């Protein structure tokens, strides 16, 4: 049922009449309304005069158009919002429908001032809404998060792909590689927008599609550029293209120039055999992130065969968009059973995919095992790149010599093909952009699911294990592997050399033909180390552990070897390597992340015994974020570290323990480990979550450090943290006192939590005194000072079983046979305390201090503490303790 048309009339400034006339077509196309400029109110109206405007259309559309017109005529806010340049395709791609939907949804006027910069103007509410949307887009783009449900994720990818291909332009490929969460947000923005303001006027709809760039305003004048200039800019942009479009054009040129050349599939089948098994191969296709974006590119064997069949029905002509539409139609015809693949198949396909890019199988399996096969392929690619770089750097350090044969291989002219695609002449950003799209294109190669040691098209970082006498046979094969140094990955990436100049060679990950090919290991593939006496079968086992890939000519030699014999006495390192996983490298260096994950494999259980604690200890306030990040080596938020710290103070007798952690840390995050400890501590009432919430994708979180200081101030407790709270020193006097005297620092040695014996330095109190409540000692001071020659700070004061307590609080001398774990807190001993009440009853009441003595003590204290802040405190102490005559005891009270 069509919406009832309404008529609305309102006024606008007369000087905006020209702007409204120029923007009429764009406003009508955006909101599906008819706009009429009626004229001025009258000559008697004082300047500036206003003119009448009339809107006709659906009620909601008229309301939105009215808000938009008010915003461009009398804007309340004018803001500029930045975004990553890689997100430029969102605002100009898909015929600018996303930008139009954003304007329709917020009623704010958006114009692209430059790549990475948007101009926003309109009413205050509209500008705030538009900025919130854009900031949320940026957040989703930078986080690259997956959707919680894999089925929902595939549906979002399919719908977004169909939507983008229906409005295809030069930015289609860039839109298809956006993160899935951002795709879902864009679909939500555009869903129903086309039908919301639909009026049935075909001309209006056609104008919305054809005049996509007319609404782009000039940043200097605020007016729309003319249609002729827009057309010229559009043609210039089509000619210039993007890194993705340039790569696609080069691929089209290569394939169109050599139509008879087909890429040999990895499974080694002929084209006829491949056509017969086409259905079986389709069932093995994995609909991953890369697959959903654009399947069956031009250099896929399946696509070449389908292009011959569909030549009469559709004209492909190297058009990427037509190819994408064929792929989407083909994927829709597949049944749900065919689309679903097992986890093992997905894992094998993902491993083979990264192997074709030139990475070793060990590194790929290691990274996938850590992050999981459901992670975004781009994130996996980044981690594999980092791991490969670390591995190659470590291997370069172990390489002893450089062999002169590298100069021979350099001059063999392997990269002399005119059709090869290199990135030497492109800038760095273009290289990175091209690499992402090369990932998408290589994902379409028809590789088999079964993992093999090495196949014809498999590009793996390998050691050369070919004997010298067999080298000429290998160089005579149809595809040769040359070990070259990759300047971007700092690693070895074998390059494929084709005997025919017509074939295309793809340089792996931006490798250059000018880079010297330096084999980091000798020709026999063994490390430059003194070897023990081993049989040949043990050597081959070592080579397999190193990830070697031997040539087909060396396979018969391996098959004739005898079965391996156990040699625990001769080679313990080999037996250890066998017990390790297949992804472990014997010569790879250990990283902090690896060591941390190894410690997580050791089980730990938080056990707090149900027994009474001590009442003389201060409240313990733990900075949970600081403790967790420290235990996680500044890379992970380790909840185990918080549990270890709580258990440490619980064993000391503390029962008043509070841990503060931001609430957003309880969400699912791969960098937050063992979150069940947070749940356990929260159930015990030890964990307190500081408030945090999400508003339009932006996190609004309270500062947890303020909660720490507030609680320590109210309870007189100690804050366990390594933070110095420098920004809160001047907040208040009480907070400064907490930061100065009540911060307990710590350290972790693996899973061992350690605190210092002297938290305030060598001249400060010991740990047991630091942890005790101050009220216990303060109540004793008047009584002890009244006793003859007995005082807390008197050198003659002795506690049985301990040393004399001096003002310097020097630690007691360690005994020769004492254990080395001196960092553990010592239990305080006060055997004199029970005898104090009876002692007080037998002694006469001491005489009160005279006014002269009070003045002398006050002057002496003012000389010691000249600050004006402490003068008031000195007067309060002297009034509160009229019997106290000991200057040392009074000084201690001032310091407290």
Curated annotation (Swiss-Prot):
The modification Phosphoserine is found at residues 226, 258, 300, 562. Proteolytic cleavage by CASP8 or MALT1 leads to its inactivation. The record marks 200-201, 326-327, 490-491, 509-510 as: Cleavage. Keywords: Cytoplasm, Hydrolase, Immunity, Innate immunity, Nuclease, Nucleus, Phosphoprotein, RNA-binding, Ubl conjugation. The CoCUN region mediates binding to ubiquitin. Does not interact with NEDD8. Interacts with NEDD4. Interacts with ITCH (via WW domain 2). This is NEDD4-binding protein 1. The lineage of its organism: Eukaryota, Metazoa, Chordata, Craniata, Vertebrata. The gene is N4BP1.
């Amino acid at each position: 049922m069509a919406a009832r048309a309404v008529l609305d009339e309102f006024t606008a400034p007369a000087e905006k009449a020209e702007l409204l006339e120029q923007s009429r077509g764009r406003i009508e196309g955006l909101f599906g309304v008819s706009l009429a400029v009626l004229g001025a109110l009258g000559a008697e109206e004082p300047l500036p005069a206003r003119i009448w405007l009339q809107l006709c259309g659906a009620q909601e559309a008229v309301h939105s158009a009215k808000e938009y017109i008010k915003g461009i005529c009398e804007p309340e806010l004018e803001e500029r919002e930045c975004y990553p340049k890689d997100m430029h395709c969102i605002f100009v791609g898909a015929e600018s429908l996303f930008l139009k939907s954003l304007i329709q949804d917020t009623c704010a006027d958006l114009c692209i001032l430059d790549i990475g910069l948007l101009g926003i103007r309109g009413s205050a509410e509209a500008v705030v809404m538009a900025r919130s949307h854009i900031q949320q887009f940026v957040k989703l783009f930078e986080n690259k998060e997956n959707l919680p449900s894999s089925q929902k994720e595939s549906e979002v990818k399919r719908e977004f792909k169909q939507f983008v291909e229906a409005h295809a332009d030069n930015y289609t490929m860039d839109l298809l590689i956006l993160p899935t969460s951002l795709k879902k947000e864009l679909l939500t923005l555009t869903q129903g927008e086309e039908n919301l303001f639909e009026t049935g006027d075909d001309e209006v709809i056609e104008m919305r599609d054809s005049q996509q760039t007319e609404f782009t305003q000039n940043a200097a004048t605020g007016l729309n550029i003319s249609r002729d200039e827009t057309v010229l800019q559009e043609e210039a942009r089509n000619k210039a293209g993007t890194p993705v479009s340039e790569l696609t054009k080069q691929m089209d040129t290569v394939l169109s120039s050599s139509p008879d050349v087909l890429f040999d599939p990895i499974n080694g089948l002929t084209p006829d055999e491949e056509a017969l098994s086409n259905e079986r191969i389709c069932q093995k296709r994995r609909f991953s992130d890369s697959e959903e974006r654009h399947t069956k590119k031009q250099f896929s064997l399946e696509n070449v065969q389908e292009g011959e069949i569909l030549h009469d029905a559709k004209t492909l002509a190297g058009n990427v968009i037509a190819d994408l539409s064929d792929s989407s139609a083909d994927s829709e015809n597949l049944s749900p059973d065919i689309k679903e693949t097992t986890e093992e198949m997905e894992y094998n396909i993902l491993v083979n995919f990264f192997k074709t890019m030139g990475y070793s199988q060990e590194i790929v399996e290691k990274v996938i095992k850590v992050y999981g096969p459901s992670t975004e392929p781009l994130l996996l690619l980044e981690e594999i790149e980092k791991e490969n770089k670390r591995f190659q750097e470590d291997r370069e350090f172990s390489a002893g010599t450089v062999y002169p044969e590298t100069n021979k291989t350099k001059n063999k002219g392997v990269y002399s093909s005119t059709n090869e695609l290199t990135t030497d002449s492109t800038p760095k950003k273009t290289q990175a952009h091209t690499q992402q799209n090369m990932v998408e294109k290589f994902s379409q190669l028809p590789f088999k699911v079964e993992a093999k040691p090495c196949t014809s098209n498999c590009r793996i970082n390998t050691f050369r294990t070919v004997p010298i006498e067999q080298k000429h046979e290998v160089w005579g094969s149809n595809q040769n592997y040359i070990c070259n140094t990759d300047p971007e990955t700092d690693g070895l990436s074998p390059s494929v050399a084709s005997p025919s100049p017509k074939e295309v060679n793809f340089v792996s990950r931006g490798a250059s033909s000018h880079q010297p090919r330096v084999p980091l290991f000798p020709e026999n593939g063994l490390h430059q180390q003194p070897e023990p006496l081993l049989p040949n079968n043990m050597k081959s086992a070592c080579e397999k552990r190193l990830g070697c890939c031997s040539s087909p000519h060396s396979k018969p030699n391996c098959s004739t070897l005898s079965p391996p014999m156990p040699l625990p006495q001769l080679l313990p390192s080999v037996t250890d390597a066998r017990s390790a996983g297949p992804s472990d490298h014997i010569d790879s260096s250990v990283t902090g992340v690896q060591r941390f994950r190894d410690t997580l494999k050791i089980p730990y259980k938080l056990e707090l015994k149900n027994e009474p604690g001590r009442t003389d200890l201060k409240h313990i306030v733990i900075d949970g974020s600081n403790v967790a990040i420290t235990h996680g080596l500044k890379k992970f938020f380790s909840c185990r570290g918080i549990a270890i710290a709580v258990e440490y103070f619980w064993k000391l007798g503390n029962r008043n323990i509070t841990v503060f952690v931001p609430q957003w840390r309880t969400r699912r995050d791969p960098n937050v480990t063992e979150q069940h400890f947070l749940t356990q501590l929260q159930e015990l009432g030890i964990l307190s979550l500081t408030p945090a919430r999400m508003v339009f994708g932006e996190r609004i979180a309270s500062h947890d450090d303020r909660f720490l200081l507030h609680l320590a101030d109210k309870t007189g407790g100690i804050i366990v943290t390594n933070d110095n709270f420098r920004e809160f020193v001047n907040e208040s006097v009480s907070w400064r006192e907490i930061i100065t005297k009540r911060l307990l620092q710590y350290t972790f040695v693996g899973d061992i939590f350690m605190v210092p014996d002297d938290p305030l330095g060598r001249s400060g109190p010991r740990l047991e005194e630091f942890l005790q409540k101050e009220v216990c000692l303060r109540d004793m001071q008047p009584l002890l000072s009244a006793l003859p020659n007995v005082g807390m700070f008197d050198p003659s004061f002795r506690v049985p079983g301990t040393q004399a307590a001096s003002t310097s609080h020097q630690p007691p001398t360690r005994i020769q046979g004492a254990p080395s774990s001196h960092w553990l807190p010592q239990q305080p001993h006060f055997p004199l305390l029970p005898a104090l009440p009876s002692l007080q009853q037998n002694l006469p009441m001491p005489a009160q201090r005279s006014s002269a003595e009070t003045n002398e003590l006050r002057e002496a204290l003012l000389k010691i503490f000249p600050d004006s802040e402490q003068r008031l405190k000195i007067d309060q102490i002297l009034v509160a303790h009229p019997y106290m005559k000991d200057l040392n005891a009074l000084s201690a009270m001032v310091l407290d």
